[in-house]
């Protein structure tokens, strides 16, 4: 948490189309996707529609945007390759707090947006107590969304508390379970509690009918964590699907990086396997931010290239004395793993921090694309962004600076817990929060590569 249909026509009444873009020598275009009336948007995600790559959907929360006094979830939709965007609110008939937004597409162009939905957290005697995770579905590229289906929901209680979902659709052409939707997340017995009897665990559910219903959630973590929401909490579970429908999940916690998998379409999982340590933990103190993290995310190469089936894990830790971005991979379903590859290419042990990393593996060309916040070129709290791309199976990366002016975060403004990126057919689109004249906004950077190469189209 670390904090009826909605129509396209109604969306234009809530937010106008807003465009801010410029092109630099690397043929990169930065476009602001939140309109001027957006209030503190954060926790971003983005997905490219494989049926129509000019159609993309990004998502974020906004803090207290009228008419609602609470944080709510929003979609940002484009049909022209990212040149212009329209804001579409996520349905919220119950008027609950929303957040931790993640959006994905299925191979047939159906969009899924999962988010938290809760009220009464951190209140001793809440007037209203409810919490869960809702999945909204769009079959028209994000113009309209279903009211939402609970993947899990608790009425009249916030214990346990469900937090930080990751979602994936099985888009593997040869999978027996193609089209299944999988969600993994952290369950807190009591969110924020330091009581050692209160535990956190990783839970899982699936849908086999395009998000209309979800199975009974079950625990997949063999070893849990505490409920403090820090290094010893199990968190950061992001599912990925292999070419034969394997479901892979990696999370962070007191044991380090932990891996689990399902070979039966998400009906059951095996024993946890610790695949790496996390020097310095996953919860960081970053100047200018209320909090920051290096929690892992996962993705699989579903292309027909030489690295098909490779599972990648991307995270941040302090093994070199400062915070660096890393990638590790397995080509045999998690039995053996590569050594960690340092993704950021600034000088080793230079004391500069990277944080909030996210990854997308292009399903057509197999490239590994990673975005992260970066302080290599600045001092103090000034922050930039870097996009790193690998076309050799994650062995080496080319780092490119995203062309936004360095900014200083405001610790009094919630900055979220992650960035986002999506890649498809050589098109790569990172999405991120940044400050412009003291105001928090969300932008995308539009890159177009010759597939499978580092060559950028002009």
For every predicted segment, state its role.
Residues 1, 26-27:
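Intrinsically disordered, low-complexity regions enriched for glutamine and histidine
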Residues 1-11:
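N-terminal secretory signal peptides that target proteins for export/translocation
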Residues 11-23:
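Bacterial N-terminal signal peptides
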Residues 27-458:
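Extracellular, repeat-based ectodomains that mediate carbohydrate processing or recognition
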